[in-house]
Amino acid sequence: MISFIINRKRVSLDVDPSTPLLWVLRENLGLTGTKYGCGMAQCGACTVHLDGQAIRSCVASVSRAAGKEVTTIEGLSPDLSHPLQRAWLAEDVPQCGYCQSGQLMSAAVLLREKPRPSDEDIDQAMTGNICRCGTYPRIRKAIHRAAGMMSTGGAK
């Protein structure tokens, strides 16, 4: 049995401890917002938070989550009210949308660590997240917009 907190709820699962966290999230817990992209931690589509830090769930075994807190895109905000989600929509960031959950999860860590990031901070923090549609300029604008919303009390 592996126990951890997922999106503020404690779970205990009887799974092979070497199973990638991504597959436990998707197949055992039904949390399909986290995507499979490359399976090699190169694209960022599978990004989740483990004790507040962004990790690639496709290469992290579920045993790594034991006794810790995991947050997925579903836990960022269940009603799309997080400033990042609102900014993403306002800036028309999504095209195909496949990378978006990973992009949002990486951006959330960035804004927690640097509430007013520079363009360079954003580029550095988002380097491991690939967008096949090339929406990088809109992603940067959305992160700046969310930072502004959060600094003026628009955070949830």
Language-model segments: which ranges?
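Signature of N-terminal electron-transfer/Fe-S-associated modules in redox systems
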Residues: 1-156
